[in-house]
């Protein structure tokens, strides 16, 4: 009887935690099978306000949660059992920490007496994520630990938190109650002991709010009208780095038009294909005319950070700025150039709505837009109308998007090709990436998380090694109920290293490229996914268009030679330099 009471107490704590998370704005919970996390798993199963996502691989599970949180702009809970199951979340937690994505890890754990003594599946879990997650260590469930203390601990840990929080939950056996009932039913039919324990939460049970609410008050001092007038008195540029779709970066274009300054944008700005900005800035900086023009800039206003283009970063670093303002949503030091500047922790909207006057040097760089358009003409000629290749596929994908679509771009070559060559277009998709740590792991799972929350047609374009890294997550693709197209650009290895100064080809082949000779048709079949292979742009465009006719996921493999993309990048760069 005492043992069963212990199992019920474990479940009660799990239900209180999950209920409080739902009240704090959690909409999704990602779960992997495991026994020690049973109180949390059963609590999630009985919680009607949470959408549950199940996956057998914790590494992919963590990245799926990352995608869900990115898309929903809300915290997402992850439930794992003890041991290496927790450790497998580490890559996703690192990415979430660097990009301010709120993940809540609920890890089941052995009780203290079973730690560091040779007990099965027991590791030291507290602080396992080091600096990459805020840590909360809960004791084993006990009537001596007040229920309101449990909830207030959760509330405090998550207050104003935009990065991962790890809540380690120790449980003694038994873990399985005789029946699973809802928290409301527990309250209604509770024994005298349980009723006494829950009494401090009577008011909490009568509403849907968290026990403790923390108000977030912004006290940042934004520039005054006089300060704005001084800042815009001269030739300036606006540079836009990584922004989320909900940041509404179109406001920046309107601000630029008001000031009369050009806008240089990164692939992750949500503005890369906008006709009113300088999207081809990476290549434009190779052009002597454009460089001469941009060197005249005295002032710079930067939104976001984490730029992909090294040339753009070098331009920012080498200029002697009279005034340098940097706007970031969070307090990150997004400052790899280490220049003297003014940092403003504020939203895009807050800055764009300031009473900006028109610049005294408005329209000083009007020549940049025609130069940007001339590069677009070059790319049509040298990419779209030539030999089948990686950049051609990336441009075809970008052109096929609408503002109702999601485009997730993988790391290594795909994101760089999009940054360098994405076409100018009037309708552009919501862009998602994993560029905090810029790893090639977890991309399929993250994209599945984004798609699951948004329920919109989605494309993921990635390289072959990235796909091999996250192969297990093809199982998540099978769960998609909207058009989802995975485009694998297979150049047989890590051929981004063709662009780097490895001393000789033997070293490049043996230690960097790692050619594998694999194709993905049987892998797609293993997971029951529709599969097409494309060896020319006509077959690719047909397969890509047809894939969106079905409310499920499909795979298109694009086979290209190992040196095609690097050779083309070199060729185009030389042409731009000479004209």
UniProtKB/Swiss-Prot annotation:
It catalyses: isochorismate + 2-oxoglutarate + H(+) = 5-enolpyruvoyl-6-hydroxy-2-succinyl-cyclohex-3-ene-1-carboxylate + CO2. It is an enzyme of class 2 (transferase). Its EC number is 2.2.1.9. Its cofactor is Mg(2+); Mn(2+); thiamine diphosphate. It comes from the Bacteria. InterPro entries: DHS-like_NAD/FAD-binding_dom, MenaQ_synth_MenD, MenD_middle, THDP-binding, Thiamin_PyroP_enz_TPP-bd_dom, TPP_enzyme_TPP-bd. GO terms for molecular function: 2-succinyl-5-enolpyruvyl-6-hydroxy-3-cyclohexene-1-carboxylic-acid synthase activity; magnesium ion binding; manganese ion binding; thiamine pyrophosphate binding. GO terms for biological process: menaquinone biosynthetic process. Pfam families: TPP_enzyme_C, TPP_enzyme_M_2, TPP_enzyme_N. Pathway: Quinol/quinone metabolism; 1,4-dihydroxy-2-naphthoate biosynthesis; 1,4-dihydroxy-2-naphthoate from chorismate: step 2/7; Quinol/quinone metabolism; menaquinone biosynthesis. Keywords: Magnesium, Manganese, Menaquinone biosynthesis, Metal-binding, Thiamine pyrophosphate, Transferase. Binds 1 thiamine pyrophosphate per subunit. Homodimer. Belongs to the TPP enzyme family. MenD subfamily. Catalyzes the thiamine diphosphate-dependent decarboxylation of 2-oxoglutarate and the subsequent addition of the resulting succinic semialdehyde-thiamine pyrophosphate anion to isochorismate to yield 2-succinyl-5-enolpyruvyl-6-hydroxy-3-cyclohexene-1-carboxylate (SEPHCHC). This is 2-succinyl-5-enolpyruvyl-6-hydroxy-3-cyclohexene-1-carboxylate synthase. It comes from Shewanella frigidimarina (strain NCIMB 400). The lineage of its organism: Bacteria, Pseudomonadati, Pseudomonadota, Gammaproteobacteria, Alteromonadales. The gene is menD.
